[in-house]
Regions:
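Catalytic core of non-heme Fe(II) oxygenases with the double-stranded beta-helix
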Residues: 92-228, 232-240
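A general structural signal for short secondary-structure boundary/capping elements
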Residues: 76-83, 184-186, 207-211, 246-251
Length: 261
């Protein structure tokens, strides 16, 4: 990795990318990114992808959405916190450590809050900027058979961000689909994010942020991305919940690594 890409320099770059991202109101307020990371750092991430055994299978909607006949989980994750990535080889660990620190930074979080103000104001009111947010970046890997049905995201979440990490532009059709809500309650496809290198999207989670993903076909080897979720961190219950989830996930991850050794 280039020495010049310090955490501070990379944070400044990502903040600038967020500030200059394209905004769209349809079907709900969201941002689109065309170059969230510097090109050379993006290639470092692509080349530093963990091995399949470094990931842990995800549950919940991502598991239930599996279209595989055997029901095998089709989404796996690696949390970008130091205690999770410490098992990676040093050359890969340094890349994901920097990425995680940048995405958890206050500067990046503040940039998202500023740019997503219309959506956050709709949900939280005039004082939206005072609502605490707890960032959790995870590296996700989807395999053929993955799909996720129309949903808005849990209101435990304040902001959803996804950065796509494909090595090339050969599978743009597997990006996330955004749905509009018609007066009769139907939710047809309105637009789709292209699954292209160094791109992505962000939105403030609300009752109208319907999105989905079609089944990933056999033409896709892996659908790699970073999911950056800002959990609402207001009040003692949410404060404890957010941090206890990190600790419990750490225990599950350590048990899995002990079984591997």
């Amino acid at each position: 990795m280039r020495q010049s890409w310090s955490v501070n320099n990379l944070t400044d770059f990502v903040v600038d990318s967020v500030k200059h991202a394209h905004a769209d109101d349809a079907p709900f307020y969201h941002l689109r990114f065309d170059r969230i990371f510097p090109d050379d750092f993006y290639m470092e991430m692509v080349q530093a992808m963990p091995m399949p055994e470094d990931y842990r299978a995800m549950s919940g909607k991502s598991k239930m959405g599996s279209s595989r006949p055997d029901g095998k989980p089709t989404r796996a994750k690696l949390d970008l916190f130091p205690e999770y990535i410490r098992h990676l080889p040093q050359t890969k660990r340094v890349v994901w450590d920097v990425a995680g620190r940048v995405l958890r930074s206050k500067e990046v979080g503040s940039a998202f809050v500023q740019r997503l103000a219309p959506g956050l104001k709709r949900r939280f009111g005039e004082n939206f900027s005072e609502v605490g947010m707890y960032p959790v970046p995870i590296l996700t890997r989807d395999i053929p058979g993955y799909r996720i049905f129309k949903h808005t995201d849990s209101l435990w979440k304040g902001i959803t961000v996804q950065f796509y990490l494909p090595p090339d532009n050969s599978t743009p059709h597997v990006g996330t689909i955004f749905h509009e809500v018609l007066p009769n309650g139907r939710k047809p496809k309105k637009t789709q994010m292209p699954f292209s290198p160094n791109t992505g999207y962000a939105f403030a989670v609300a009752d109208n942020t319907w999105h989905s993903a079609d089944p990933v076909g056999p033409e896709v080897k892996t659908r790699d991305s970073i999911l950056l979720t800002y959990f609402v961190d207001a009040g003692p219950w949410r404060f404890v919940r957010n941090r206890s989830r990190r600790f419990l996930n750490l225990l599950l991850n350590e048990v899995r690594n002990l079984k591997r050794s």
